[in-house]
């Protein structure tokens, strides 16, 4: 038995200078797991609650001492003495103890940090790397895949202080044969994009996720700049590199009049018009994945978008599904989107995260493992992507150590599997829904 002997919570700082929760889980035998909760900027209304103190005298009200206290007191008392290898039981104890639908008592940030730290401690006690232990928990022991990166190289929306409405413009190095080659391609395009922007007299300051955040005349301009950078790097757009976007449409949807108001370029669309606007962009550029292409509450709009684009474009639900199996189940039944974005802290525990990935895969949806805009050096999502063979990961651009930490962990995992004589396949474009 991998007995839990001590649980410690603390307040640390994330990549935006805001506090977050870090947890340590100690086991008999000296095994320790350490994990931190991430934090989002554009958040779905149905996400599990991130508990903040609201004390304006500390961190402008964003302190997490209440969540930390929950870790050090109620949660610690409930799980000390339990077997860390019973991940589902540990998570359920915390969920039941919290007693709310959205984890608002302790905070999803408290529960998640402990959940992940527990998994890391349990993996250590079994002498397994985290990705291998996650595969065991997932019921797919020994089945691994390296993920195709979706690299956010131009940031807009809530992730940047510029006039670009669409939140993320991403590249996917689909022509690569390995994860390491994919990262090299991504880095080369990123550096060439800096040259393209500088030549146009534009800013090369970066946003929350490490992508550039220039002011541009339109969203199409962002895609044109990326196209130029891809070609400048010596690659063929549509063959070596494909494009993806996160619209984060809820951020510019006007609930009062039902219009999508893109103030950056002075355009306003109905739900169906916005789908056709995106359709035109897909005709002009090899965009193979669109995330949150409608407001989270506009299910009628999502159904229409899925009908129009779903046979050839991966339509990812982030704010739409918030990593929640109840909401995802309803979406699957109604034919809404064809992919889910997976964010640990939207649901608040490893067990529930694995359940969402399984439900998606069983329904023929893809699952894209994702960071948040507020991150730490914690690289657990890299192990999650490999251990569930999810096939795709979204963890930012080729700058900012909080993003690169995940890529470097993927490099280590890929190398370790190769050395063991069990290399994990890199799926390339096949990982993307509608592109196999």
Swiss-Prot record:
Its EC number is 4.2.1.11. (2R)-2-phosphoglycerate binds at residues 167, 343, 372-373, 394. It comes from Haemophilus influenzae (strain ATCC 51907 / DSM 11121 / KW20 / Rd). This is Enolase. Keywords: Cytoplasm, Glycolysis, Lyase, Magnesium, Metal-binding, Secreted. The active site is at 209 (proton donor), 343 (proton acceptor). GO terms for molecular function: magnesium ion binding; phosphopyruvate hydratase activity. The keyword Cytoplasm applies. GO terms for biological process: glycolytic process. SMART domains: Enolase_C (SM01192), Enolase_N (SM01193). It holds the Pfam family Enolase_N. Pathway: Carbohydrate degradation; glycolysis; pyruvate from D-glyceraldehyde 3-phosphate: step 4/5. SUPFAM superfamilies: Enolase C-terminal domain-like, Enolase N-terminal domain-like. It is found in: Cytoplasm; Secreted; Cell surface. Mg(2+) binds at residues 246, 291, 318.
């Amino acid at each position: 038995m991998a007995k839990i002997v001590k649980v410690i919570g603390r307040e640390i700082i994330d990549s935006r200078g805001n506090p977050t929760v870090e947890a340590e889980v100690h086991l008999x035998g000296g095994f320790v797991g350490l994990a931190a909760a991430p934090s989002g900027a554009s958040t779905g209304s149905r996400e599990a609650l991130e508990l903040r103190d609201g004390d304006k005298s500390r961190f402008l009200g964003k302190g997490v001492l209440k969540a930390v206290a929950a870790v050090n007191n109620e949660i610690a008392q409930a799980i000390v003495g339990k077997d860390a290898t019973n991940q589902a039981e540990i998570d359920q104890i915390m969920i039941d103890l919290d007693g709310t639908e959205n984890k608002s008592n302790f905070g999803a940030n408290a529960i998640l940090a402990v959940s992940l730290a527990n998994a890391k401690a349990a993996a250590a006690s079994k002498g397994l790397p985290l990705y291998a232990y996650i595969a065991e928990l997932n019921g797919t022991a020994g089945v691994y895949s390296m993920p195709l990166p979706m690299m956010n190289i131009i940031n807009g929306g809530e992730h940047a202080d510029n006039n670009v409405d669409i939140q993320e413009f991403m590249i996917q190095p689909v022509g690569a044969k390995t994860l390491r080659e994919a990262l090299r391609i991504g880095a080369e395009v990123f550096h060439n994009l800096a040259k393209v922007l500088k030549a146009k007299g534009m800013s090369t300051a970066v946003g929350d996720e490490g992508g550039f955040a220039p002011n541009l005349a339109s969203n199409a301009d962002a895609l044109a700049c990326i196209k130029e950078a891809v070609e400048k790097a010596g690659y063929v757009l549509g063959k070596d590199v494909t494009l993806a976007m996160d619209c984060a449409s809820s951020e510019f949807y006007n609930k009062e009049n039902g219009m999508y108001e893109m103030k950056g370029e002075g355009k306003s669309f109905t739900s169906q018009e916005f789908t056709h606007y995106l359709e035109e962009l897909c005709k002009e550029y090899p965009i193979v994945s669109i995330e949150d292409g409608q407001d989270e509450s506009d299910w009628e709009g999502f159904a229409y978008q899925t009908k129009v684009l779903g046979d050839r474009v991966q339509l990812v639900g982030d704010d739409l599904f918030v990593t929640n199996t109840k909401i995802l189940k309803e979406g699957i039944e109604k034919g809404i989107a064809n992919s889910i974005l997976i964010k640990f802290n939207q649901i608040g525990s490893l067990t529930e995260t694995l359940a969402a990935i399984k439900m998606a895969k069983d329904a023929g949806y893809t699952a894209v493992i994702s960071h948040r805009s507020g991150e730490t050096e914690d690289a657990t999502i890299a192990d999650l992507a490999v251990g569930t063979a999810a096939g795709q990961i979204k963890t930012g651009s080729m700058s900012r150590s909080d993003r690169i930490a995940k890529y470097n962990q993927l490099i280590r995992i890929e190398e370790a599997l190769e050395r063991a004589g069990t290399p994990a396949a890199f799926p390339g474009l096949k990982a993307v829904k509608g592109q196999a």
